Amino acid sequence: MERGPQMANRIEGKAVDKTSIKHFVKLIRAAKPRYLFFVIGIVAGIIGTLIQLQVPKMVQPLINSFGHGVNGGKVALVIALYIGSAAVSAIAAIVLGIFGESVVKNLRTRVWDKMIHLPVKYFDEVKTGEMSSRLANDTTQVKNLIANSIPQAFTSILLLVGSIIFMLQMQWRLTLAMIIAVPIVMLIMFPIMTFGQKIGWTRQDSLANFQGIASESLSEIRLVKSSNAEKQASKKAENDVNALYKIGVKEAVFDGLMSPVMMLSMMLMIFGLLAYGIYLISTGVMSLGTLLGMMMYLMNLIGVVPTVATFFTELAKASGSTGRLTELLDEEQEVLHQGDSLDLEGKTLSAHHVDFAYDDSEQILHDISFEAQPNSIIAFAGPSGGGKSTIFSLLERFYQPTAGEITIGGQPIDSVSLENWRSQIGFVSQDSAIMAGTIRENLTYGLEGNFTDEDLWQVLDLAFARSFVENMPDQLNTEVGERGVKISGGQRQRLAIARAFLRNPKILMLDEATASLDSESESMVQRALDSLMKGRTTLVIAHRLSTIVDADKIYFIEKGEITGSGKHNELVATHPLYAKYVSEQLTVGQ
């Protein structure tokens, strides 16, 4: 689902605020970088710059004394200073590079940790590909700014100021002429810098949107191919590719104009200053050595100005990244450990007049009330889209009811810590999620502690999954592929059931899967589910007649409302729609 207008407006409205120094500093603090590396890098850069500033000053007397012969010692000293400056600058670059990598490492860790702790409703509004862009691209932009552009701009400004000071000492008239020319150059560059800032925001947004579309299509590549939807998928991405192209053209214009315009302005300034310097020599006000020394300082400035220009370019590009990362880190996340620790065993689970809507649009659930006694089986039945899965989402606390409450043993489930609550709940869905990795990793996913091979084989036995795992080449260490594509649907279901056995939940939630399985797989999965349900409070979205008949209580849900409840025989006799649903929709098991 794409971001809604409200989120887009919120981003746009905060644009100016997020690019402020306050938000940038906040973001860097969140990364908890190695400040010592930054200090060492800056100090080394300052030392290298100070050495570089001494060279033109030493050239002045060296040139003026050429009439009396070449001073080999002074020439060697000038060369040594150049080499020393380059070596110290290299050290500064290496240290700052390490600092930058520590920033991006810590920032990515912080952003990733934030992402996985965000509530499910956040992921309903933002594409996963867009979030991947935040994690990869935006953090890299911030790293480039803080590790490269800012230190280089700092040392460049120091070189600029130092050069001006030494030039004032050598010849104030020529320096004054340059000081007058610099604001004119900056005035020329200001519109281009503003243009670059706008491009930075737009490019990052479009790139994130394109990555979202690409991630969505690639994650469902089997659906794309089986539906002959390659052309449709290509067309869907075409608009974003074209948008990125247009932004790229603007960025190319920006990058292309920035340095040449700056360089042209600088060269015109230098040419004018050189002409003025020759005039001063002709009038006896200045020596040739002084002019050459000042020209060397000006050559420093020629290198400085593009660096400063690059800083503004990177600042413009990073401004959007900084804003989006700051917004992400400011999002309210789930608090896993806040609340009571409660043993759910032997307690009654109840819903009291629960209403729910995903947003301000149509209400999904209306006045839902039910009760699940300890170790009982509660079945939810009814037409598709009635709200059965939404009830499960509320029980897993992915969302909060808009009215009413859900209790366990008379205590609101909101008062129980999320970690404690979810650790005692098991969920087996129609299409159980399997992560890329080994069978062992999938069985123990999210569980703390060490599990022996014997523990894993035991739960595989209970889930009727041992035989197919034993026949695999690496058994427990077999890779199942992304989303478990290397194993069948029935095998994925049985692994999910084995995982639920290993969790040993007090409350079990099942969304029966039968329609997509062959008869043999269905039989094995159902036997595993029957075994898993024993001795547990079980809530099941029923698709099989046998489950309905065996349930202690059935709640019939249509259009978000419970229109009937009771045992199977009672509902068949008193609820015509239920009787029709049972005869037409439910699977008759063996």
Swiss-Prot record:
Under Enzyme Commission nomenclature, its number is: 7.6.2.2
List the catalytic activities from the record: ATP + H2O + xenobioticSide 1 = ADP + phosphate + xenobioticSide 2
The organism's superkingdom is given as Bacteria
One cellular component GO annotation, for this chain's record? Answer: plasma membrane
Domain ABC transmembrane type-1: residue ranges: 38-317
Q: Where are the transmembrane segments?
A: 35-55, 79-99, 150-170, 176-196, 261-281, 292-312
Q: Where is this protein localized, as stated in its record?
A: Cell membrane
Keywords annotated in UniProt: Antibiotic resistance, ATP-binding, Cell membrane, Membrane, Nucleotide-binding, Translocase, Transmembrane, Transmembrane helix, Transport
The positions annotated for binding ATP are 382-389
Q: List each copy of the ABC transporter domain by range.
A: 349-584
Q: How does it sit in the membrane?
A: Multi-pass membrane protein
Q: Which Pfam families match?
A: ABC_membrane, ABC_tran
What are the recorded Gene Ontology BP terms? response to antibiotic
Q: Which GO terms describe its molecular function?
A: ABC-type oligopeptide transporter activity; ABC-type xenobiotic transporter activity; ATP binding; ATP hydrolysis activity
Which coarse location class applies to the principal site listed for this UniProt protein?
A: membrane
The UniProt entry's sequence similarity note says: Belongs to the ABC transporter superfamily. Multidrug exporter LmrA (TC 3.A.1.117.1) family.
Q: What does this protein do?
A: Efflux transporter for a variety of amphiphilic cationic compounds, including antibiotics.
Report quaternary structure and partners: Homodimer.
What is the name attached to this protein's record? Multidrug resistance ABC transporter ATP-binding and permease protein
List the source organism: Lactococcus lactis subsp. cremoris (strain MG1363)
